[in-house]
């Protein structure tokens, strides 16, 4: 970001912009919402709401699950994402009531292929890496990638990308064509 009008801040989102004095055209959250916890969803959406301009947009990119009230896998909780929580569609929608959901895209089926590609690359790189890591790490990382791929292949987990606006985009939101 050198030379760009960008500023990075490392902080707890709950301490960001408490008085709402800062306003942004766009807010993006990628791979973070899984660590918010369902008890804090409304607080997170409140922080975004007071931080985005009335005509601004928020991009929320998160892994989610199909059913509310189910916990995270104990192994994932212990070794990969301690205290991680996957939101359900119902939990997201209920918590985002102060926004218009302009777009909700599901990349879940694609994420299975992504995880399998990561697994293939990990296997191919392992001969170069095995001197830096032990056999336990190898087994755990394979287990993580393959189990996660299985949850997406079974369509139990999803990868969602939501575009939210405070008041709705005049004429409706149009996703940019790639």
Which positions does each model-derived feature cover?
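Hydrophobic/aromatic anchor residues within beta-strands of the central parallel beta-sheet
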Residues: 5-8, 58
């Amino acid at each position: 970001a050198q030379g760009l009008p960008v500023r990075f801040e490392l902080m707890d989102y709950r301490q960001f912009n408490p008085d709402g004095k800062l306003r942004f055209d766009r807010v993006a959250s990628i791979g973070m919402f899984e660590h918010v916890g369902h008890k804090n969803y409304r607080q997170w959406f409140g922080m975004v709401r007071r931080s985005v301009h009335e005509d601004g947009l928020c991009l929320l990119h998160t892994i989610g699950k199909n059913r509310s009230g189910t916990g995270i896998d104990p192994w994932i909780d212990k070794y990969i994402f301690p205290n991680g929580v996957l939101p359900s569609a119902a939990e997201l929608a209920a918590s985002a009531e102060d926004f218009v959901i302009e777009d909700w895209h599901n990349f879940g089926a694609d994420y299975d292929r992504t995880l399998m590609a990561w697994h293939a690359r990990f296997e191919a790189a392992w001969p170069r890496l095995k001197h830096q890591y032990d056999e336990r790490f190898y087994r755990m990382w394979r287990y993580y990638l393959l189990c996660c791929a299985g949850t997406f292949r079974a369509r139990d987990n999803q990868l969602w990308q939501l575009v939210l606006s405070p008041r709705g985009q005049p004429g409706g939101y149009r996703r940019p064509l790639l």
